[in-house]
Amino acid sequence: MATVQPIVNSHLSELDEDVFHHFGFTTKSFDFKEKFGDVKFVCVCGSSGRIHNFAISMAKLAGLALPVENIAGSHARFVLYKVDHILFADHGIGIPSTLILMHEVTKLLYYAGCKDVLFIRLGTSDGLGVKPGTIVLSDRCVNTKLEPYNELCILGKPVRRQTKVDSNAVNELKKLSENLSLKCSVVVGGTITANDFYEELGRLNGSICTFSKEEKLAFLQSVYDHGIRNMEMEGAAITSHCNLTGHRAILVCVTVVNRLETDEVTTSTDEFKLFEQLPGQLVGEYLKRNNGIIVR
């Protein structure tokens, strides 16, 4: 259960119609409680194609007819699918895009009357000291200063929001992984959420680099020694927003490079596609066992 009293935006009650600009619908498009009132889980990832494929796999597992309907409008920024008690959406790259999605999905859940929903990010990430193709279950999410906060600037003032993950769900997933025949390793560790792919993640191969190779390696080794096992760019947006809106969140990411060895993602296209599917194999079984779908 979520432990923080959720914040409700009182201004929403003043709206005759709330426009979900990035989903391409409004509160008058359909009855939110009827359409979404049974949602227990929200699965998100960066790519619209990847989340579509995961929604299809869950629909097949549930014995539902295909295709799955994209509920979002034809000119929407994001996609949105629903299979039984699960919503599926893409969040794009980085905190700004992800926060836009989080605002609109959590408003959707508010209008639908859904509480204590578990958000699951299925993503790709840089690994630290683990080989490519390893699933990292995040036991904490921190910024590049190793602080458990997502930092924003609202009306010119700095705001810090906690990035707590649902430790119970993390433990359940880890235990489940030990009983499945997954073709990968699953580890529990800390996750860094950075603001970009190059400089904040300590890469030497961006168009700008103001640090040496030695400084980079010292930083990466330091965060590894603090228990960090992967780095990405969205988790803090998801966890912090869930903490404020009365929901829970976990991060399930597969590593595509070991940053203690190289900056470059050199996996082949076929190997990368295989890696992308690994989080869904674990999460899909978890959703099935926790009544996310109804097997027909």
Curated annotation (Swiss-Prot):
Pfam (any one): PNP_UDP_1
GO biological process, one term: nucleoside metabolic process
SUPFAM superfamilies listed in its UniProt record: Purine and uridine phosphorylases
InterPro entries linked to this entry: Nucleoside_phosphorylase_d (IPR000845), Nucleoside_phosphorylase_sf (IPR035994), Uridine_phosphorylase_euk (IPR010059)
Gene Ontology cellular-component annotations: cytosol
Matches recorded under Gene3D superfamilies: Nucleoside phosphorylase domain (3.40.50.1580)
Superkingdom of origin: Eukaryota
Any GO molecular function: identical protein binding
Subunit structure: Homodimer.
Xref: NCBIfam families: euk_UDPppase
Entry similarity comment: Belongs to the PNP/UDP phosphorylase family.
Identification of the protein by name: Inactive uridine phosphorylase B
Native species: Schistosoma mansoni
Organism ancestry: Eukaryota, Metazoa, Spiralia, Lophotrochozoa, Platyhelminthes
